């Protein structure tokens, strides 16, 4: 009966526990590209889009900081490559996630074949406060956080494509993608409780 209702588009609202109570292990996004990617610059564009989506999902889930980034790559020969690494400090900033993911990607993918799929995820969530050092720029981080929140509000109201990364405009097909909105993967617990 519940399956039939869902098939007809009926949506049931329920009280959702906080992310800490749900014990979310990771948040990520991946994409199988419509054509082979042949160089780092093309892969970099997709990684930045994926990282932007992952960071937005983190904020949406109430998980603002992660300590580990994982990158996944699949060649056109369908061979898969994985690498993960720790961030210098816990972060929820898309740029830092993307830069770490690009660095990991460069270490794991040798370009023996063109690239067909990419994925970025974060894990090892951090719920405590951050001890700043005298070299960190707290004002800049606070401005970035407020900017991210403003972008999230605008995207929620007008759709994810309304504000895009400049890098996606290098490829006309990339700017048509709505990675966050069209590629939703629910945790198992979502289906178990509905």
Each language-model region and where it sits:
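Acidic, metal-coordinating catalytic segment for phosphate/diphosphate chemistry
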Residues: 89-194
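DNA-contacting surface of Y-family translesion DNA polymerases
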Residues: 6-114
